[in-house]
């Protein structure tokens, strides 16, 4: 099963989550592509059966605007039939950006299998939840 983990990370926190998710997907037998959004192509999303997208909270509880937002907007129509999980880290407020992102997915006909947030750098518990997210994607 082809899986892509595509993420943007400014501090390394969301990247740590992406690495953990990708590692577990690979362990479970997925043919995995792990790529930062700056290097990602539309085909990375199009060719995957399973997709995990990661972006931390930015600004006023929003997705990163220079790379991640344009990429996400460009793939919305082609990921409607994918198994999708979304994830990211935050350092202030309460993680509202994830609820906004889930709602945006729903409004665009995109089903989210799981959504995961981690406060600051993911600790052991957050990394375990990353592995659980990968397991949910593989089911």
Per-segment meaning from a language model:
Residues 6-8, 87:
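Short hydrophobic segments within beta-strands
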Residues 13-16, 20-37, 44-139:
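FMN-binding flavodoxin-like domain, especially the glycine-rich phosphate-binding loop
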């Amino acid at each position: 099963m082809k899986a892509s983990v595509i993420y943007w990370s400014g501090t390394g926190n969301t990247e740590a989550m992406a690495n953990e998710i990708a590692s577990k997907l690979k362990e479970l037998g997925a043919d995995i592509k792990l790529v930062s959004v700056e290097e990602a192509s539309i085909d990375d999303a199009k060719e995957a059966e399973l997709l995990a997208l990661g972006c931390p909270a930015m600004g006023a509880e929003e997705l990163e605007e220079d790379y991640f937002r344009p990429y996400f907007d460009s793939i919305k129509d082609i990921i409607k039939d994918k198994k999708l999980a979304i994830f990211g880290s935050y350092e202030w407020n309460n993680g509202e950006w994830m609820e906004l992102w889930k709602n945006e997915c729903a409004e665009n006909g995109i089903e989210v299998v799981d959504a995961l947030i981690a406060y600051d750098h993911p600790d052991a518990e957050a990394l375990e939840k990353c592995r659980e997210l990968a397991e949910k994607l593989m089911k």
